[in-house]
């Protein structure tokens, strides 16, 4: 039989993999909120027109549709943690390439297309891992706790992005921090064990 909500929450809160998912998801929120809020100002500071920023955000939204769908499908075929690791590595690479390459409308569009494809692919994969590890009955409840970390990251991405810009008159350190968090999240997801959800009899034993 299935576990009760109390048993499921107790299992999750005492499980290393739940906390790896939770802490790792903070990086996702940081990156998405920082880019969505501060990228237009970053591009303007580097002499690019507002139309480049709006086009880039539109590209992110467009390619996100394909990325979210495909990562959801791929998560039924391959290990979700492995796909999630590749998402975070891809984001880090895209951010570092944006900083390294000469900034132009075309490099911005390329960055936006790649980042958009990787934008919300973490969501179906994270939900899938929670469901597989802890069972589907309370997956929404558990994802809510994990998503809280994402929203903390979102707050930090917006607030810290502005604070660091005011302190250093540049967004460079925020971009570097976003890439570093992405690499850290990849490391955190790598040891997650995707396994069958426990049942009440096993828990009682």
Regions found by a protein language model. Give the residues of each.
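Extracytoplasmic gate region of multi-pass secondary transporters
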Residues: 10-69, 157
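Paired intracellular helix-loop junctions of major facilitator superfamily
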Residues: 130-139, 169
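Interfacial helix-cap and linker-helix signal at transmembrane-aqueous boundaries
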Residues: 43-44, 74-75, 160-169
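Cytoplasm-facing, short amphipathic helices at loop-to-helix transitions on the intracellular side
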Residues: 18, 80, 136-140
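Multi-pass alpha-helical transporter architecture, strongest
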Residues: 178-205
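C-terminal transmembrane helical hairpin of 12-TM major facilitator-type secondary transporters
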Residues: 34, 52, 58-64, 68-71, ...
């Amino acid at each position: 039989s299935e576990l009760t909500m109390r048993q499921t929450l107790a299992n999750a809160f005492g499980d290393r993999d739940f906390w790896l998912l939770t802490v790792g998801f903070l990086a996702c929120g940081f990156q998405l909120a920082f880019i969505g809020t501060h990228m237009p100002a970053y591009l303007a500071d580097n002499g690019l027109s507002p139309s480049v920023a709006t086009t880039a955000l539109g590209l992110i939204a467009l390619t996100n549709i394909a990325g979210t769908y495909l990562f959801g499908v791929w998560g039924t075929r391959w290990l979700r943690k492995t796909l999630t690791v590749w998402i975070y590595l891809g984001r880090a690479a895209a951010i570092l390439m944006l900083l390294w390459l000469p900034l132009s409308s075309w490099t911005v569009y390329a960055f936006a297309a790649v980042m958009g494809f990787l934008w919300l692919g973490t969501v179906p994969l994270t939900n899938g891992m929670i469901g597989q590890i802890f069972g589907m009955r309370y997956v929404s409840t558990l994802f809510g706790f994990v998503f809280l970390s994402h929203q903390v990251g979102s707050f930090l991405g917006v607030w810290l992005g502005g604070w660091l810009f005011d302190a250093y008159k540049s967004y460079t350190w925020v971009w570097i921090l976003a890439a570093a968090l992405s690499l850290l999240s990849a490391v955190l997801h790598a040891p997650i064990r995707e396994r069958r959800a426990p049942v009440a009899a096993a828990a009682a034993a």
